[in-house]
Amino acid sequence: MSDSQTLVVKLGTSVLTGGSRRLNRAHIVELVRQCAQLHAAGHRIVIVTSGAIAAGREHLGYPELPATIASKQLLAAVGQSRLIQLWEQLFSIYGIHVGQMLLTRADMEDRERFLNARDTLRALLDNNIVPVINENDAVATAEIKVGDNDNLSALAAILAGADKLLLLTDQQGLFTADPRNNPQAELIKDVHGIDDALRAIAGDSVSGLGTGGMGTKLQAADVACRAGIDTIIAAGSRPGVIGDVMEGISVGTLFHAEATPLENRKRWIFGAPPAGEITVDEGATAAILERGSSLLPKGIKSVTGNFSRGEVIRICNLEGRDIAHGVTRYNSDALRRIAGHHSQQIDAILGYEYGPVAVHRDDMIIR
């Protein structure tokens, strides 16, 4: 084995269930065995697990997935305890302790909570404990959900300071077309930079029991790679897949980390789920993309959502394209009032000001 590395392993519902309505315990046992081998060799392992709702369905005997949020949260509440018990039981066979972390979008949006989550996660790793992370589906509504465990795993990789992120799924990796519909589809083994062509290839296929498709895996890979983390999409059913990834053996699709990763604060900005959105005019778009300028109120055309000063927001051009994320210096109500006005008018309009810019260039990430 090479020197000690930190690996985040994301296990989708389709991997944990094998496409059935029940957890595939035999397969989970094998995945734990692989992780335990790496742990014994000195590597640091983080598990991002799906499957809480599936575990709840199995335990309570629900034949179908309910449609209401309340019923899904009920299943998640029951299933989450079953799931962590399973991880704890299996890792204990190898004398390994696990620690549960349940996160929501709010933990990622707020810088202080983000840093607290980071400190907790790294404390677990420093004490040779395997963190088991999931979104807190029992309490998370649409407004506070990260959205899927692919993106959650990318955020976990940033929190952990990971070297690699492994997204295990029911597919071998990213193909040139959907291999389930096109027998001519070819596996893409290496990716250097994610563009619109790749996003179009990924589409939005979703497994029957999960919430993430190949499109969300590309989003996760984009976030992780820009933070300097190699990302691999591979089949969870492949024998020895986790160990092979750590050995550097070609498995699935490898998204190469950027040579110059984002600094720590900008990793948070890039990874945090946006709390809202603003649309800017052509002049502001050009200033941001071509000249690296801050965003002035004059260039703002509209504001969507309700957010506070200091939260991360999405900046879009007139066509709706996501061009940047940044930390806003004004809340949503204030931005609506000063949108389209010169910076010199801020104090007269609001009765106060936090400076002439809406989003400073130092607090902005170009998408």
From Swiss-Prot:
SMART domains: PUA. InterPro entries: AceGlu_kinase-like_sf, Asp/Glu/Uridylate_kinase, G5K_ProB, Glu/AcGlu_kinase, Glu_5kinase, Glu_5kinase/COase_Synthase, Glutamate_5-kinase_CS, PUA. One of its GO terms (cellular component) is cytosol. Pfam families: AA_kinase (PF00696), PUA (PF01472). ATP binds at residues 10, 169-170, 211-217. NCBIfam families: proB. This is Glutamate 5-kinase. It comes from Enterobacter sp. (strain 638).
